[in-house]
């Protein structure tokens, strides 16, 4: 149960949160529903301190035409700001979108799906896509109940499956006989797409929003395709490749096959405008790859009494990758809503690591790359320093350069990119 006016009065929210904290109940996770304009960063921080783990914002549509039809106003600027603020506080924003209103055309649905992708680019969010529901007493009900049909079960049609995961025949008979009473089990035809296609979008497009929002948005721009059309093509491509019935999509499907689909679609584009698409795809692939393994960070110390014989080994859960473009700059532009065509090529080294539920991506220089590569679990730090000195230590004494290597290893170890290997003792005495 959730109260959808919980944040309507700021004073009430603050009082509630302070009382929860005062009574020591903030270890109990809770969820709420909110308007975008009834919270701000300080309130969100207080809610998180009081135990709020997730909240739902009703976005509904990214189409101005559709928003006018349902008499709702959404400030896009506030939307993206609030999503970023909510996620930054450690609260997962659930964003509710609706597609398939009776007057909607392809462009209207494209606007909504594009908005969903942009929220996915901002970071950790939970997209929820639904089809319109006919509820008694609403204008939608009064205008369209007579054209309603039964094709697919939507969110509000679930909960009556009492016969091995299916509805009783008697329940089905009642729903069919009294559409005005059981209107939430009915669908509204939409000229843009069939109800079956809309249901596929509602069911599976959130996976793309979570895993590949950047690449998918770029792919739609490069191919000049409607986002929904492109997604349906992806599902059909996957169905043909896996020879699987019925049409479905899993997180594993996305990770294993979306890259191939992207490459095939891009190969059909005669004039490529954004040569950095494959860098963005690789960035999202590596983000998912490191997320599969989340080992606890180990305590890292160096015995300074035997520093020259210290051996470090790169954490196998950390991944290094060189990109052809400055991917962090491109992603910052994406988050600001800029999807420009051209960037100057610029080699960029990134290091990926997952710690608990947080993805860490840091930019490194060539020295750090080579240092990590030489930390193989066998070579003592003195040997690593000697091998790097010729390229990176020309303006330093060997002792000063060795000290800088020690400092770098300590930092990388504390951040979880290096682990302690064995130690080779007596090296100084033997030499």
Please provide the spans of the model-predicted regions.
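A structural motif corresponding to the C-terminal lobe/cap of the Radical SAM core domain
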Residues: 10, 17, 21-219
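Long, low-complexity, charged/polar intrinsically disordered regions in eukaryotic proteins
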Residues: 302-357
